[in-house]
Amino acid sequence: MKTPLKPKFQPAKIANAVVVGGMIAFGKTTIAESLAKHLKGSKVIYELEEQDQLADLLLAKMYERNDELLYAPLFQLYFTLNRFNKYRKECNNKTPTIFDRSIFEDWLFAKQNIHRPSIFTYYNHLWNGIVKELIFKHGIPALYVILEGDWELFEQRLFQRNRKVEIDNFAKNKDYFKNLYKIYGEFIKNVCYDFGISHCIVNANQSVESITKQVLEVLKSKNLDWEII
């Protein structure tokens, strides 16, 4: 039986948070930082932190694909647990928090990277337990911003940002990137529908200013107790 791409829980509360999600290199961090400038008192929680040497090591080992049966599961478990810890601590601050990607997207990365069924079964069980706590105790985000674009935009942005680990290992990971790209947008939309998460879909091939303006208009329409500046 194939593992379904759709989680099956329903939300219990809304967190004081926004998530910016989407395919690798579509500009999530840039958009998150731009939104933070317009939401008074808000902060950005980054997916990757400069001082996190373990995350850098695991990411590099995964992309190198020399021992992916070991490093891919370690990478996915580390990111999932680390992201959940950040979310539960920061998702209900007095002022909005903007998250660079979410734990929902971690499942998709894990599905593409963990190749041993027994290990993925363990990961899936762990992930489901974490997500139950997230949605019932801490809450789903008030808005999920989904950045979409074409394959050409992905390649352009990936090489433009020039992260050594991605460029050096692009050939090894091209099929992985293509498979991820094909299902990414629909997966996030399905997650939002299944979890009852309010979301907006934005074309990533626009200026930062244009995307920011569109998202702020959506936030204004939701009548949240957030000060937009």
From Swiss-Prot:
Coiled coil: none annotated. It holds the Pfam family dNK. SUPFAM superfamilies: P-loop containing nucleoside triphosphate hydrolases. Keywords: ATP-binding, Nucleotide-binding. GO terms for molecular function: ATP binding; deoxynucleoside kinase activity. ATP binds at residues 22-29. CDD domains: dNK. GO terms for cellular component: cytoplasm. It comes from the Bacteria. Gene3D superfamilies: P-loop containing nucleotide triphosphate hydrolases. InterPro entries: DCK/DGK, Deoxyribonucleoside_kinase, DNK_dom, P-loop_NTPase. PANTHER family: DEOXYADENOSINE KINASE, DEOXYNUCLEOSIDE KINASE. This is Uncharacterized protein MG268 homolog. It comes from Mycoplasma pneumoniae (strain ATCC 29342 / M129 / Subtype 1). The lineage of its organism: Bacteria, Bacillati, Mycoplasmatota, Mycoplasmoidales, Mycoplasmoidaceae.
